[in-house]
């Protein structure tokens, strides 16, 4: 399985340690296409050509069997990736860390076609990722055996 992981890199306060833990968990189920995108420092990331990043990421997103997006920090890029994945029929799981005085984006939370998992503890989110990917793997096995 190929999974596209999405999270805020330039916007908000990217939690790179949390993203790396998520990526490690996702990688138990297959290839994380965007894994290396989260290994760059913010300075390195802004040094890449934006058109190159866009083309690379859209290629990966087209190739992905699923998208897991961490949406706790607002990000236009993450929202764009979610919209494209939804348009293309790619299964999605959105993760939102509950924060006092803040709410998830109404455009994401109000879209009943999107699965958003709200969590307070990281382990809850990791278990949600496991369940989401295991369900996709099961569907894939079922459809290939028919």
Outline where the language-model segments fall.
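Conserved catalytic or regulatory cores that recognize and/or transform ribose-phosphate-containing ligands
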Residues: 1-146
